[in-house]
Amino acid sequence: MHQVISATTNPAKIQAILQAFEEIFGEGSCHITPVAVESGVPEQPFGSEETRAGARNRVGNARRLHPQADFWVAIEAGIDDDATFSWVVIDNGVQRGEARSATLPLPAVILDRVRQGEALGPVMSHYTGIDEIGRKEGAIGVFTAGKLTRSSVYYQAVILALSPFHNAVYR
């Protein structure tokens, strides 16, 4: 059984990690241990590079806390131009997989507040009345009318980031 350290305690992210690992390695193939670690970037990262740096930092910090694990996984959400997206970073001590999620365009009224320094989650909670929306369906669930959720979009990115770990051509 793979010991997987999730560099987050966010249920939406943990669900995506668990589902993706079980899809690739088989049901019951892993045990997820969530840990709260620092990203080293602002609460609301801007741009692809800052967001990816946050995910990489989280993986490194999780690895220092639990060096005996098989995998360390981080999902860092950010804002790039007028959209939200995330970077997924997965490390197994030998190689790393990274993938960027799909992007969701955000309305100007939301972006204005985020650009003024507020994090997307609290802004979305304010507009929707859904407490801790970032730990649930997220802006993705709201603006896709539930057709996608934060977790379902992250799931795809985790699957992509896992590609180097089960395909021999990457080695």
Curated annotation (Swiss-Prot):
GO terms for molecular function: ITPase activity; metal ion binding; nucleotide binding; ribonucleoside triphosphate phosphatase activity. The gene is yjjX. Belongs to the YjjX NTPase family. Signal peptide: none annotated. Its EC number is 3.6.1.73. Keywords: Hydrolase, Magnesium, Manganese, Metal-binding, Nucleotide metabolism, Nucleotide-binding. Mg(2+) binds at residues 38, 68. InterPro entries: ITPase-like_fam (IPR029001), Non_canon_purine_NTPase (IPR002786), NTPase/PRRC1 (IPR026533), YjjX_NTPase (IPR050299). It is an enzyme of class 3 (hydrolase). Binds 1 divalent metal cation per subunit; can use either Mg(2+) or Mn(2+). Substrate binds at residues 8-13. The keyword Protein biosynthesis does not apply. It catalyses: XTP + H2O = XDP + phosphate + H(+); ITP + H2O = IDP + phosphate + H(+). Its cofactor is Mg(2+); Mn(2+). It holds the Pfam family NTPase_I-T. This is Inosine/xanthosine triphosphatase. It comes from the Bacteria. HAMAP family: Non_canon_purine_NTPase_YjjX. SUPFAM superfamilies: ITPase-like. Homodimer. GO terms for biological process: nucleotide metabolic process; thiamine metabolic process. Phosphatase that hydrolyzes non-canonical purine nucleotides such as XTP and ITP to their respective diphosphate derivatives. Probably excludes non-canonical purines from DNA/RNA precursor pool, thus preventing their incorporation into DNA/RNA and avoiding chromosomal lesions.
